[in-house]
Amino acid sequence: MQNVEFASLIVMAVAIALLPFAAMVVTSYTKIVVVLGLLRNALGVQQVPPNMVLNGIAMIVSCFVMAPVGMEAMQRAHVQINAQGGTNITQVMPLLDAARDPFREFLNKHTNAREKAFFMRSAQQLWPPAKAAQLKDDDLIVLAPAFTLTELTSAFRIGFLLYLAFIVIDLVIANLLMALGLSQVTPSNVAIPFKLLLFVVMDGWSVLIHGLVNTYR
């Protein structure tokens, strides 16, 4: 009995230690923070907003996006606890199984089918045949990397559109400086105020955050 409780304690400790990592790769955090980083680079202001602010914005928006999933997980865990008549260290695994289903549903909804198929094929090639035969495309071991890859692809597509909008300003400013004979002036330094002005006039923060949130409808 003590060995079982010790093993369950180890499993719970490992699960708690992996929570920050899981919060980054199996939530909306990855896409949001990458898009915000690409936006900062596109604007040409390398240190503003600072990394702490970007991470804070990404965490807050991710908490909003993931709130229904988290609440559903807590509700199912509560139902499991009531069914067990309480909980102790030996009943952690059934509790985790009940709580992970909402996350599986979220990942499955927002994961590209092509990426899931890739990891399923890779498992057939890399895993032992007996283990690969038991694998399903909605298992977390498949969904987690497929979701992360889907999010990164989506983030870079959004980043490309952001860069495309601001690079036009860079080109216009560079041509104007050359026409005025000011070739020694760095175009990027002159373009930054105009980029910021365009971003403010277009209500850029609201448009970008609203767009990111709406990708998870």
Swiss-Prot record:
One of its GO terms (biological process) is symbiont-mediated perturbation of host programmed cell death. It is found in: Cell membrane. One of its GO terms (cellular component) is plasma membrane. Keywords: Cell membrane, Hypersensitive response elicitation, Membrane, Plasmid, Transmembrane, Transmembrane helix. Pfam families: FliP. It comes from the Bacteria. It is a multi-pass membrane protein. The chain crosses the membrane at residues 6-26, 52-72, 158-178, 190-210. PROSITE patterns: FLIP_1, FLIP_2. Belongs to the FliP/MopC/SpaP family. Involved in the secretion of PopA, a proteinaceous elicitor of the hypersensitivity response in plants. This is Hypersensitivity response secretion protein HrcR.
